[in-house]
Regions:
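Alpha-helical multi-pass membrane segments and their bilayer interfacial helix-loop junctions
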Residues: 1-235
Length: 235
């Protein structure tokens, strides 16, 4: 309606859509209605596209995505809704990729880098929240033991064999976030000397720290081993 017959200004329509999406998300959690939450997220992701006035204000776009994805993380704290997490992840990184291919220049680095880092860490956190929620719901089984100093090949094989079966490790979200975030990071740091190298150091440090944090949790062994594998890949 805004596009065909602009009765209201775009900011007002945008704000109304934000409120509507937030209300639907709250109702979805209270009523345990995953489909409603899914519709809210899809509508929320479509909102900036539907009400875009062509001004190209990317800071508003990325701030909105950060707010929306924070809401997804809040839902993940209470619900292990994997399709919802994946929808948010795919939509967010596709929007970022489309904008980057169309509009990114090195001058945008200082303002876009914080958003990229935030979403990388946020969706890594959502993968952790998913694992913990699945455990609390009884969705995990005991894992065969694997030494913390096991070779990388053994760790990857262990994850591939058991990660899907126990339904604790959301391998698509965890490794997909890693791959998408690092690819975008390499793209926006291409103008910097050794940009990709320093980015790999950062990723290795974060995943290594995450593995250390989970060192004492036997229930989340597969998640800890996944973080260790990610750290070794970037080391």
């Amino acid at each position: 309606a805004l596009k065909l017959h602009p009765l209201l200004p775009a900011p007002a329509v945008f704000a109304a859509m934000v409120v509507l999406v937030a209300a639907m998300a709250v109702m979805a959690v209270r009523q345990d209605a995953q489909i409603m939450a899914q519709a809210a997220v899809i509508g929320g992701m479509a909102a900036p596209i539907l009400v875009s006035d062509g001004s190209g204000n990317y800071l508003v776009l990325f701030s909105y995505l950060a707010l929306l994805n924070t809401g997804i993380a809040a839902i993940a704290r209470f619900k292990a809704w994997r399709p919802l997490n994946l929808t948010g992840f795919v939509c967010t990184f596709c929007i970022a990729l489309f904008w980057g291919l169309k509009s990114y220049t090195p001058a945008h680095f200082s303002t876009t880098e914080p958003f990229l880092i935030y979403h990388w860490l946020l969706y890594t956190l959502i993968a952790c929240l998913f694992a913990r929620r699945r455990l609390s719901e009884g969705g995990g089984d005991a894992l065969p033991p694997l030494a913390d100093n096991a070779p990388l090949g053994d760790i990857i094989g262990h994850i591939a064999k058991h990660g899907i079966r126990v339904h604790i490790l959301d391998h698509t979200l965890l490794f997909g976030t890693m791959a998408a975030a690092f690819a975008l990071q390499c793209g926006i740091t291409a103008h910097l000397t050794h940009g990709s190298g320093w980015s790999a150091v950062l990723f290795a440090a974060v995943y290594g720290a995450a593995a250390l944090v989970l060192r004492g949790s036997s229930e989340l062994a597969v998640l800890r081993q996944a973080f260790a594998a990610c750290a070794l890949l970037f080391a």
